[in-house]
Amino acid sequence: SIAMINELAKVLDTTSTYLIGYEHDEKNIRSLSDIMDFLFKLDRVTGLNFRIDVKRPPHYDEWECSITFNGKDKSADFNADMCLFLEEFAEYREQYRNGGMRSQRYKELQDKDLAYYSATEVEEKPLD
């Protein structure tokens, strides 16, 4: 189980993702286009639906854009997982930003989440 892997990682002073063989590249974002490319790829994931909301002047005072996942969308198998992840991420991200969490703990929580979801495979929708 993932809980056992997390405990083993603590005992062995390593990460859960290392133990399960999951590798992630921390230097792959080099430009804003890399982030935009990720959004294009995200849009092609089967089982994941999201809405993009845009609020801008003159109809709104601020210019805001957001990506929304509906966790109750039955046609999107991974939306509930995204909502659970984002809910937890928002909490520990806020704690970290406000100085209530050390960077080591922040990295441990990231590693735990990546290890947990690493076995959940997704497929891309074919381009027409």
Predicted ranges, named:
Residues 10, 14-104, 111-128:
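Charged, helix-prone or intrinsically disordered regulatory segments positioned adjacent to compact structured domains
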Residues 2-5:
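Long, hydrophobic alpha-helical segments
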